[in-house]
């Protein structure tokens, strides 16, 4: 008991994070089935190399959990919760490479308390595995590039491929890696390393089933996510209401703590200005 009290006193912020996750876990049985949950659960029950609107990673993971724990709404929610918890742990590891211990704890609190992360803990979407494999990709690339650990090029290739198999936006990982090396005087020399190209080749091989499915289905998914989505964007009209509404929406979803801080300081500033007037 003394050791537990000592841990809590020395790791207040970490305990807050654990408390958030315990709370989320306890309410899992009371969260109902959402349309997205049922939709992507059917992915896993009808296995394919890919699907019309997204690759199938979320469906595969739902199938894996249902095979182990059975088919139920709770198991679907447990899948999302488990993957999101792994994402938090991966984020903590990644952030530890860049931040001091104090800033690391604050960063962990910020990401854990985001409304967006709470939604992902209870709602099956391609973003659930995307965030995990994206974060793992960055961890492996950090090890490979900055610490010159060759084997992590292989792990990075696998992680980048699995991220793409979660959602197409993960293709930006490879582009981001190449762009970073182009603009980095220190690490541009890695273009001459076979490990870089081996990593990219591995990622392409992991992604290959998605390309194969698209090839056999007239590239239906790629077309849907590119030209059709682009045409809908072209119809969008910018207005002040939409602009500021979008900013507020992102702040609320991604950084609610920071959002509340901004509101608090803004109100204090307005009150102070009014009193001075």
Spans of features found by a protein language model:
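Extracytoplasmic catalytic/substrate-binding loops of multi-pass membrane glycan-assembly enzymes
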Residues: 27-41, 50-62, 70-74
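Short acidic/glycine- and proline-prone juxtamembrane loop motifs at membrane-interface regions
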Residues: 35, 116-130
């Amino acid at each position: 008991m003394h050791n537990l009290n000592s841990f809590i006193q020395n790791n207040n912020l970490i305990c807050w994070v654990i408390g958030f996750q315990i709370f989320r876990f306890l309410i899992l049985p009371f969260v109902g089935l959402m349309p997205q949950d049922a939709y992507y659960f059917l992915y896993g029950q009808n296995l394919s190399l890919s699907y019309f609107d997204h690759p199938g990673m979320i469906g595969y993971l739902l199938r894996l959990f249902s095979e182990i724990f059975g088919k139920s709404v709770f198991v679907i929610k447990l899948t999302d919760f488990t993957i999101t918890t792994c994402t938090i742990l991966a984020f903590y590891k990644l952030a530890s490479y860049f931040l001091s211990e104090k800033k690391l704890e604050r960063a962990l609190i910020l990401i854990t308390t985001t409304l967006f992360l709470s939604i992902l803990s209870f709602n099956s979407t391609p973003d659930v595995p995307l965030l995990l494999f994206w974060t793992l990709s960055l961890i492996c690339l950090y090890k490979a590039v900055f610490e010159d650990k060759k084997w992590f090029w292989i792990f990075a290739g696998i992680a980048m491929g699995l991220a793409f198999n979660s959602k197409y936006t993960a293709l930006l990982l490879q582009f981001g890696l190449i762009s970073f090396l182009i603009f980095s005087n220190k690490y541009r020399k890695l273009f001459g390393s076979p490990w870089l190209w081996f990593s990219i080749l591995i990622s392409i091989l992991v992604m290959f089933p998605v390309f194969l499915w698209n090839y056999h289905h007239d590239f239906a998914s790629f077309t849907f996510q590119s030209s059709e989505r682009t045409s809908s964007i072209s119809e969008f009209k910018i207005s002040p209401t939409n602009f500021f509404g979008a900013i507020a929406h992102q702040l609320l979803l991604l950084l609610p703590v920071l959002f509340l801080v901004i509101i608090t300081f803004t109100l204090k500033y307005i009150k102070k200005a009014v009193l001075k007037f």
